[in-house]
Structures are given as structure tokens and as C-alpha cells.
Curated annotation (Swiss-Prot):
ATP binds at K622. One of its GO terms (molecular function) is leucine-tRNA ligase activity. The gene is leuS. GO terms for cellular component: cytosol. It catalyses: tRNA(Leu) + L-leucine + ATP = L-leucyl-tRNA(Leu) + AMP + diphosphate. A motif ('KMSKS' region) lies at residues 619-623. It comes from Shigella boydii serotype 4 (strain Sb227). This is Leucine--tRNA ligase. The lineage of its organism: Bacteria, Pseudomonadati, Pseudomonadota, Gammaproteobacteria, Enterobacterales.
């Protein structure tokens, strides 16, 4: 064994061994308990970043630990390879998205291997290959036949920069989630999948997910947004149709003083024929944002349509307004307004001088003061005829029942969730497998024409999708009739909604899934990824699983038992102000810093002498140029050091602050482990451990070893507090470094301890542990070694520490045998100088003894 720890030598050797032995390839084995550990697959952007490294290190630690428990562990990896960035990069680099993507995959695959992740590479998949997306296309055609897919023209969120549609979830504060451009509203024909048909199940089954973070479940609950209410029909004078509205507050119905319809509503369109002001308003609304966050904050505007609706219970005529806060896509495109008890309705009514009628009493029973704002709390009705005096629940039921009896109301459950618009106007995605025949019939692409292959040898102009620009590509023949293919492609969330299931049978040629393999491995035991996916990917992921279950492919209700959302990786961020006042962000690697005595940064400059402004720690990002290249760190310290720092610096679900001093500390620790094993093995062979012949000191050290095994096992397995597991191993290492190594049993005990330490560290730092296991002559490869088991007998304490008090004040701490009697403890306490001093010449009036813990002598 060489004396120095040289990760650059050992890591490549160990990785080659894993490749040659195919160590992490697995097949179904009914004789073993399975464990499916999955990290969210990466987008092949070109280089791994520290967020990837953290995510995949957590997954690898869990997978290696479960493997050492003797389970059949599947840990696959693949590439979420479709998506917009490839188009931009292709234009910029004068290439096509496909070669750019495949080059990136090859590069990033090497980076993953360099970090020592134990993946089953035989299952690797890339979602941009026809072998993958053909089954997604086939499944879509089956959903269409089941009535779960439809096409309609709808107002969508349109990103003018990316030239594509965004789902509501992809609009953050009125801007595109990807490029931060202001989102516009546009009418466009789109394909939808009926996720709303599964809304109740998606909501109710959240209760089955005991091991998902409450925050994620809460976000999904709110996004699905189930509400119970009443649908009410209004007659409208001089208009051929009725208006239908939905309300969750029928108790306030007697205070309804106007209705509001969307600008795109047929009633508004009809009224606009003779109303130029309304026509102009409708035009203006075409550019209104359709994201909810934007709707909530924008100025509320409207125009009176001139139509009057009739209140079903009072018979009063109330005006119908067109308003920019009502959307055709939500509900019926019409809402009832109760300005006395809804703040938005109140602001609109105040602005346009509409009637405000209070119908709910204030909490103290008085009439509400509506001079400044609406009263939105629930309460007792007044000003409501026969319903006066009823509380919220009684009024809800009484008014709902009356409207139902009159034939103008119906109790309904509504959802905030909308159907999933899966059409994208981009090129680099899976073609949607639908065709339009010459006679106008729309139908799924026949099975014998699947997959509809996306051409990869294309020229990108940065504006139009190559398959839209090429009229020949769309031409096909179906049932002997000329037809045109759909030129939209799938939202890339389609591919990431079912990849986890395809990993169970990536080579299967007969269909989307081999049910036998899928049902052996699924559900995923632990799924690891960022919380930013809570209401997009993680909702579609659950939805697709239920679709596949109902198609008979899988037999479980949910795709993953446990979800672990890792925290972000933060780093120092610095900038200097340029000549034009712009901020120029400088990498923390290039910042020369001065720190105060507490280690805080007080001054910074770069190599060019610019005074730098330090903005603190923030998420690693390109925009702030504060990303740290994992490859540079691996080349400098080794993969094991980077992995160890990632797992030690912070709990897995909390933010991690990147500190190179911490990386150096992790590296020093591994050098100490190496040194201890080197010094131990240099002394030659080791005798067998004889636990009955150990001295008290040796027993105490062995107790520490086995207590550490118990703690680390609990920390990794049950608690998943990986940082505290590492801290416990470090603490044990400090004790081992000071332990005597001269005697035969000293060395035998050290051998047992080091074999345990190396196995406990193996999930975190597998390369060094693989090597040290061989040097310690451990049995076989460490990859097949069992996890160490704590010896219960070794952990039993022979002695215990008792606190001795006189009149409640601590005077001594004594070590006594665990089976010592009260008399023996009192006798031993009396031998302590300080205790004897306070007992001299006084009478002990009372003795309080808590066995093995406390002796309090009350004297007077």
C-alpha cells in the first residue's frame, strides 16, 4: 500500500473495475427484496453543475447503502433530451439540436462516471430517440381513443421570445419560467390531455404519500384547488341564451349586484357589434396575460355590455359587464359579483359606480362598514329576505336547495386545475401523432406509421420549426387518402412523466412497458429532486402513473413511495460596476478576499484590480457567474472529497453553502483515514479478536465502534441525516487515531474498527473505501460486502456516570458499576473530597437517588 492518498490514481482504477465487472447492473430477482432509487434525470445542457452533483450524490449514497443491506438495488440514469435550449444552442453554434444533444450526453456521461455514481448503465435512455418516444406516441393515440385527449382553440400563455405556448405552471409572476420574458395571450388550436378527469384521485391519493414532504403535497392540493359550490343560471333580457356562473359562496347570493363576462364571451362579442368602446376593450384584452399571478395584480377594467340579467331570487335586473379579470378558460367565462363581500368585486364596483349591497353582518352583529373595503369573512345573513338570521353553512344549504328546486341551480364540485395543454410550436420535441385527412377528419396516426420520426438532419433559422417550414414533411397517406401530419410537438414534460417506468424495461419491443418487470420494480422507493418541480413534473408524473395503471401496465396507484427534495447549492457572489453602470459578475474562484477575525468577507477585488461588491451567498447560477465547476473540484481534490463535502456540509433537504475550506477539510479527513489504514497494515497480519480477553479500555473503544455503527445505520437508513452520520464516523476516527496499537488485541480491535469505518464510509466515498477494503483484506469486493451490524453486547455499559449533589448543588460526578446499589453509590460518593467536605459535621436528613443518574444528599 502506498503511503500517500492519491485520488487521481485510485479513482480511475476503481471506476474501470466497476465498468468491467458491470457491478451495478441488475435484473429482477424474486428471492431478494428490491429497492428502486431514482434521481430526476438531467437535461443534457453540456456540463454538470453542483446542483446535479448534490442530487446524484444523495441518490448514490442511498443506493449503495441499500445494496449493502442485501437488497436488489436499481439505480438507473438517462437524459431528458428534448427541449428548447438545444434549439438556441444549435442556432448559436450553427449545428442541429440532435448532434449538439448527443455530444453533450457523451460529455456529461463521462462526468457522471468520474464522480463514481453506481448506475446501471445498461438501462440508460435518451428521451429524444424514436425507440423511446414511439411508445409515448402510441400511448397518446390510445388516450385519444379513450376520450382522454381532445383539441380545442384556447387562449394560451405565449412566450414571444421562445415562440411557444407555456402551461400556467410555467408562468412565474407573469414571465416565462425559462427566459423571463413577459408572457402574452394568444388564441391557438391545441391538444389537451384530460388531467381533470383524475383531479379527485390526484387530490385524495396525496393522503397515501406519507413519505412525501408536506410542502409538496400542500402545493399540489392548492394547485388542484377543489371547491364545492353552486352553478347558477341567469336569464338575460334581449339575449337568446342564459348565463351560467359558479360560486363557492351562495350564502352571499342576495348581494349579487352585477355579472361580469370574459371579453371573449359570446354575449360580449354580440354586444360589441353596436358598441365601439366595447369592441376596443375586447381588442385590448387580447393582449391581457392569462397567468393567475398577473391577473391578481393587474388593474381591473371593464365596459358595460348594455345587457341586463335577472336575479333568480329577487327578480331584480342587474347589469352585465365585460371585464378583463374574467377568462373564458376558467369555468363558464362568466362570474357573479358580490361587491359587499368580495374585494375584487368591491374595487370594480367602486371604480364604475355599481351598486354595493351588504348581506352579511359583521362579527359583532352590526351592519358592516363598507366605506373602505368589502367584508370577506363568513357570518350571519341580513338584508336577504327569507334567509335572514342564517349562519354561513345554513345559508349555503338553504340558498343552494332553493335554486335547485327552482331549476336554476345545481350543486357542483369545481377544480382550479386545468387540462394539460401538451402542444408546443417548437421543433425539438416528439411529434404529436395525429393527422388531418383531406376531408377534414382528424384521427390518430395509425399504428403501422408509428413512430412519427422527427427528422434530425435539419437547418435551424431560430424562428420557424423545420417541420413547420417543410411542407413535404407533413404529407402522408392514411387509409388511401392524403393527409397532413400535426406539426406541433409534445410538451417535454410528457417524456419526463413516464421515463421512470421505462427504466424497468428499456429494451422491451412489444409495448410501452413490460408489466412483469415494471411491477417488480415499481413503485420507486425513493425519488430525489428539487422542490421547484412540485406542481409541474411531480403532478404529471403521478397522473401518468394512474393512466398507465388504468391501461393495465402497472398495478400500483402512485409512482414513488418517498420523495426527497434536496436543498439548493449556494456560493459567494461578487460584482463590480462597469463604465456604463452595468453589473459585471465575477466568479468566486477569481475573487481575492479579505476576511475579519470571524471569517466574514470584508473586502474583495479581482485580478484586474476591480473593487468587488460582495452580495452574500446566493444560488449558483449563470446570471451571477457564481457556479463552481464540479470537474475542476474533482481534478483538484478527487471525487470522494467532493461527495463527502456535499453530504457533510448540510442536511440533504437544506441549502448547502459552498465553501472551499470545507472541501479542504473533507480532503484532510480522507487523508487521515488513509494514513491510519496505512500505519495499521504496515504492521503485518492481525490475530483474531478475543472479546472475552479485552481490557476495560479496549472494551470502551469497542463500545464506541459499535455505538457508531448503530448511530450511522439509523442516521442513513431511518433518519436520512447523512451529515450527522459522517460526523459520528469522524468522531470515531479521532478516537481510533489515539488508540494504542502495540498489543495483539489492540491491533485486532483496530482491524474490526477499520473494517467497520470503511464500510460505513463506502456509500459516501466509494473509491477510497474500495481500495482500503482490499488493503485490509476484507472479503471480496466492498461493493458486495454486507453493512456492518452493531453488536448489542459490545454496546452494554459496564459503568455509568452519576451526578452527586449536596442540597441540590453539583459537588461531584462519579463513575460506578451499572449494577451498583444505592449504598455502594453513597459510599463511593463519600470518597470524593468535595462531597466529604460538605458532609463534615452535618446530618444527612434525606437522600434522593435516581438509579444510575443522580444522588442528592439533603443536609441540615
Amino acid at each position: 500500500m502506498q503511503e500517500q492518498y492519491r485520488p487521481e490514481e485510485i479513482e480511475s482504477k476503481v471506476q474501470l473495475h466497476w465498468d468491467e465487472k458491470r457491478t451495478f447492473e441488475v435484473t429482477e430477482d424474486e428471492s431478494k427484496e428490491k429497492y428502486y432509487c431514482l434521481s430526476m434525470l438531467p437535461y443534457p445542457s453540456g456540463r454538470l453543475h453542483m446542483g446535479h452533483v448534490r442530487n446524484y450524490t444523495i441518490g448514490d449514497v442511498i443506493a449503495r447503502y441499500q445494496r449493502m443491506l442485501g437488497k436488489n438495488v436499481l439505480q438507473p440514469i438517462g437524459w431528458d433530451a428534448f427541449g428548447l435550449p438545444a434549439e438556441g444552442a444549435a442556432v448559436k453554434n450553427n449545428t442541429a439540436p440532435a448532434p449538439w444533444t448527443y455530444d453533450n450526453i457523451a460529455y456529461m456521461k463521462n462526468q457522471l462516471k468520474m464522480l463514481g455514481f453506481g448506475y446501471d448503465w445498461s438501462r440508460e435512455l435518451a428521451t429524444c430517440t424514436p425507440e423511446y418516444y414511439r411508445w409515448e406516441q402510441k400511448f397518446f393515440t390510445e388516450l385519444y381513443k379513450k376520450g382522454l385527449v381532445y383539441k380545442k382553440t384556447s387562449a394560451v400563455n405565449w412566450c414571444p421570445n421562445d415562440q411557444t405556448v407555456l402551461a400556467n405552471e410555467q408562468v412565474i409572476d407573469g414571465c416565462c419560467w425559462r427566459c423571463d420574458t413577459k408572457v402574452e395571450r394568444k388564441e391557438i388550436p391545441q391538444w389537451f390531455i384530460k388531467i381533470t378527469a383524475y383531479a379527485d384521485e390526484l387530490l385524495n391519493d396525496l393522503d397515501k404519500l406519507d413519505h412525501w414532504p408536506d410542502t409538496v403535497k400542500s402545493m399540489q392540493r392548492n394547485w388542484i384547488g377543489r371547491s364545492e359550490g353552486v352553478e347558477i343560471t341567469f336569464n338575460v333580457n334581449d339575449y337568446d341564451n342564459t348565463l351560467t356562473v359558479y360560486t363557492t359562496r351562495p350564502d352571499t347570493f342576495m348581494g349579487c349586484t352585477y355579472l361580469a363576462v370574459a371579453a371573449g364571451h359570446p354575449l360580449a362579442q354580440k354586444a360589441a357589434e353596436n358598441n365601439p368602446e366595447l369592441a376596443a376593450f375586447i381588442d385590448e384584452c387580447r393582449n391581457t396575460k392569462v397567468a393567475e399571478a398577473e391577473m391578481a395584480t393587474m388593474e381591473k377594467k371593464g365596459v358595460d355590455t348594455g345587457f341586463k340579467a335577472v336575479h333568480p331570487l329577487t327578480g331584480e335586473e342587474i347589469p352585465v359587464w365585460a371585464a378583463n379579470f374574467v377568462l373564458m378558460e376558467y369555468g363558464t367565462g362568466a362570474v357573479m359579483a358580490v361587491p359587499g363581500h368580495d374585494q375584487r368585486d368591491y374595487e370594480f364596483a367602486s371604480k364604475y359606480g355599481l351598486n354595493i349591497k351588504p348581506v352579511i353582518l359583521a362579527a359583532d352583529g352590526s351592519e358592516p362598514d363598507l366605506s373602505q373595503q368589502a367584508l370577506t369573512e363568513k357570518g350571519v345573513l341580513f338584508n336577504s329576505g327569507e334567509f335572514n338570521g342564517l349562519d354561513h353553512e345554513a345559508a349555503f344549504n338553504a340558498i343552494a336547495d332553493k335554486l335547485t328546486a327552482m331549476g336554476v341551480g345545481e350543486r357542483k364540485v369545481n377544480y382550479r386545475l386545468r387540462d394539460w395543454g401538451v402542444s408546443r410550436q417548437r421543433y425539438w420535441g416528439a411529434p404529436i401523432p395525429m393527422v388531418t385527412l383531406e376531408d377534414g377528419t382528424v384521427m390518430p396516426t395509425p399504428d403501422d406509421q408509428l413512430p412519427v420520426i422527427l427528422p434530425e438532419d435539419v437547418v435551424m433559422d431560430g424562428i420557424t420549426s423545420p417541420i413547420k417550414a417543410d411542407p413535404e414533411w407533413a404529407k402522408t397517406t392514411v387509409n388511401g387518402m392524403p393527409a397532413l401530419r400535426e406539426t406541433d410537438t409534445f410538451d417535454t414534460f410528457m417524456e419526463s412523466s413516464w421515463y421512470y417506468a421505462r427504466y424497468t424495461c428499456p429494451e422491451y419491443k412489444e409495448g410501452m412497458l413490460d408489466s412483469e418487470a415494471a411491477n417488480y420494480w415499481l413503485p420507486v422507493d425513493i425519488y430525489i429532486g428539487g422542490i421547484e418541480h412540485a406542481i409541474m413534473h411531480l403532478l404529471y408524473f403521478r397522473f401518468f402513473h394512474k393512466l398507465m395503471r388504468d391501461a393495465g401496465m402497472v398495478n400500483s396507484d402512485e409512482p414513488a413511495k418517498q420523495l426527497l427534495c434536496q436543498g439548493m447549492v449556494l456560493a459567494d457572489a461578487f460584482y463590480y460596476v462597469g463604465e456604463n453602470g452595468e453589473r459585471n459578475w465575477v466568479s468566486p474562484v477569481d475573487a481575492i478576499v479579505e476576511r475579519d477575525e470571524k471569517g466574514r468577507i470584508v473586502k474583495a477585488k479581482d485580478a484586474a484590480g476591480h473593487e468587488l461588491v460582495y452580495t452574500g451567498m446566493s444560488k449558483m447560477s449563470k446570471s451571477k457567474n457564481n457556479g463552481i465547476d464540479p470537474q475542476v473540484m474533482v481534478e483538484r481534490y478527487g471525487a470522494d472529497t467532493v461527495r463527502l463535502f456535499m453530504m457533510f456540509a448540510s442536511p440533504a433537504d437544506m441549502t448547502l453553502e459552498w465553501q472551499e475550506s470545507g472541501v479542504e477539510g473533507a480532503n484532510r479527513f480522507l487523508k487521515r483515514v488513509w494514513k491510519l489504514v496505512y500505519e495499521h497494515t504496515a504492521k503485518g497480519d492481525v490475530a483474531a479478536l478475543n472479546v472475552d480477553a479485552l481490557t476495560e479500555d479496549q472494551k470502551a473503544l469497542r463500545r464506541d465502534v459499535h455505538k457508531t455503527i448503530a448511530k450511522v445505520t439509523d442516521d442513513i437508513g431511518r433518519r436520512q441525516t447523512f451529515n450527522t452520520a459522517i460526523a459520528a464516523i469522524m468522531e470515531l476516527m479521532n478516537k481510533l487515531a489515539k488508540a494504542p496499537t502495540d498489543g495483539e488485541q489492540d491491533r485486532a480491535l483496530m482491524q474490526e474498527a477499520l473494517l467497520a469505518v470503511v464500510r460505513m464510509l463506502n456509500p459516501f466515498t466509494p473509491h477510497i473505501c474500495f481500495t482500503l477494503w482490499q488493503e485490509l483484506k476484507g472479503e471480496g469486493d466492498i461493493d458486495n460486502a454486507p453493512w456492518p451490524v452493531a453488536d448489542e453486547k459490545a454496546m452494554v455499559e459496564d459503568s455509568t456516570l452519576v451526578v452527586v449533589q449536596v442540597n441540590g448543588k453539583v459537588r461531584a460526578k462519579i463513575t460506578v458499576p451499572v449494577d451498583a446499589t444505592e449504598e455502594q453509590v453513597r459510599e463511593r460518593a463519600g470518597q470524593e473530597h468535595l462531597v466529604a467536605k460538605y458532609l463534615d459535621g452535618v446530618t444527612v436528613r434525606k437522600v434522593i437517588y435516581v438509579p444510575g443518574k443522580l444522588l442528592n444528599l439533603v443536609v441540615g
